[in-house]
């Protein structure tokens, strides 16, 4: 349940009525002035909050912060792990930007930077396009495969990644916007 009010005092509650019994909503977060929210297949409440006009967001799961400065418009959830891109806009010149990150049990692991697009095939295989170039009528980059902890270059001048099999929750918090 998401409640919104004119004074910016929005709240998120969990209310599970699947067993048919009467229950009381449980507050998850009471400081969600600007948020985007969705539910995973295993009923985790995933939402994001922006901090004072920043283009990036902090991502929360069931009221717990799992990542700061992340792109909440493209999150994948598979077998208890979240996959997302961090630091797209880069606030520090020394820090890598657009870092594909896996969050498993609250621990973040950086996979590769300069990632524009990615697709989680399964927990051990991720395709990603890095180093996107935008020139004339061409928008493409280098395709890599992250397989069993190693990164392998596949091809260059790749424009998109397509998959026909959905084995995970694709979370687009922009699509499920509740602002």
Put a short name on every predicted segment:
Residues 16-21, 61-64, 103-106, 146-150:
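Short loop/turn segments that connect beta-strands within beta-propeller blades
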Residues 1-3, 45-49, 82-86, 127-131, ...:
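Residue position within the beta-strands of beta-propeller blades
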Residues 23-29, 63-68, 107-112, 151-154:
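A short beta-strand motif characteristic of beta-propeller blades
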Residues 122-124, 131-179:
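Hydrophilic extracytoplasmic domains
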Residues 1-20, 150, 170, 179:
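Short intrinsically disordered, low-complexity coil segments enriched in acidic
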Residues 70-74, 85-98, 111-122, 127-139:
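Intrinsically disordered, low-complexity segments enriched in Gly and acidic/Ser/Thr residues
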Residues 32-41, 70-79, 113-123, 158-171, ...:
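Repeated scaffold domains used in trafficking and secretory/extracellular systems
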Residues 7-15, 53-60, 90-101, 135-144:
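Structural motif
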